[in-house]
């Protein structure tokens, strides 16, 4: 009897995830804690280790497929472990019981109405729903009981489009799900015919998560963006002075830690920027902590690791942590815990050569600070035209919560601190 390894409960409220990559194949020998696969959810890519030592017999869930907690992913020849259970198996047993009940109900429905589609019989208040956490939240926000919605995604998964169709009084046809199951996951080959050849490929789990988060934020929060710039002559000199000292400590000192400190000070001065809105209860959540998300551009997509308690850390410590999290983001090693709990976010388009832009709020946060490149520009100082390094700043905010004048005052506060690093350190 083979040992069945099921998708474990990895915490963070995650009930399912996409199998991004398998690191083993049938016939491979694995040891305990060897990485079996990578699973992508709404928050991060998580490595799933083997709980036992044994030989891989069969991979049951291929790459690109969404699996639920408790679903068997792989079978192993691991003598002595055949009857061992792990966290998440209870969900699988419940799933089997529900499946039996569903079959029984379908038989009764068929006896009354043999021509009724089976897909319609599956939707109901007692069925088990497969849906990403973001879709479940979207359903709650729209006042929809997701158990009543017929899913058209792979394995009957409920998509955001299914919620919209339900609200519109209809549902997507069930055959679409069957077609998706039968369709190959590989990209369609390019056609050499015609003037405009095209290819198609499946969206990655991270790209889908980013797309859903961006659409949800723009649809939920009325965005307003203020654009300004700060004279960072003194800041450039300050960084230059301490850059070598930081290097001696093995730290790469950038301008980002200074921006983090300035933003934290602004959040303290204007606490409305450090809030969120509970759309279900219509309550304002005032956050009494300062966790700053740092948007990181990676080959897999945009990830946002979080600097916890940024108000308690000096510049060098912030620089070190930012560098470490950025490296983990690029290597795909971030854990869900390192990407949760942000109260406000910074995004940097300056590293790509950009200046002003309209950053999208990382909902449910209510503000996001965008920083652009530092460019030499002519300015008037003490009645004379001089060249000065100017830092482009873009502050997007949720107008439901923050008034324009308040946002501009907060941006002015940030500008003042970045223009005077000594004052910034006094504030910090």
UniProtKB/Swiss-Prot annotation:
Taxonomic placement: Bacteria, Bacillati, Bacillota, Bacilli, Bacillales
MF term (GO), any: lipoic acid binding
UniProt region (Disordered), positions on chain: 88-123, 177-201
Gene: pdhC
Function: The pyruvate dehydrogenase complex catalyzes the overall conversion of pyruvate to acetyl-CoA and CO(2). It contains multiple copies of three enzymatic components: pyruvate dehydrogenase (E1), dihydrolipoamide acetyltransferase (E2) and lipoamide dehydrogenase (E3).
Subunit structure: Forms a 60-polypeptide structural core with icosahedral symmetry.
Bias (Basic and acidic residues) ranges: 89-110
Cofactor note: Binds 1 lipoyl cofactor covalently.
Keyword Nucleotide-binding set for record: no
Statement: the UniProt record of this protein carries the keyword Acyltransferase: yes
Protein name per Swiss-Prot or TrEMBL: Dihydrolipoyllysine-residue acetyltransferase component of pyruvate dehydrogenase complex
Organism of origin: Geobacillus stearothermophilus (Bacillus stearothermophilus)
PANTHER family cross-referenced by the UniProt entry: DIHYDROLIPOAMIDE ACETYLTRANSFERASE COMPONENT OF PYRUVATE DEHYDROGENASE COMPLEX, LIPOAMIDE ACYLTRANSFERASE COMPONENT OF BRANCHED-CHAIN ALPHA-KETO ACID DEHYDROGENASE COMPLEX, MITOCHONDRIAL
Cofactors required: (R)-lipoate
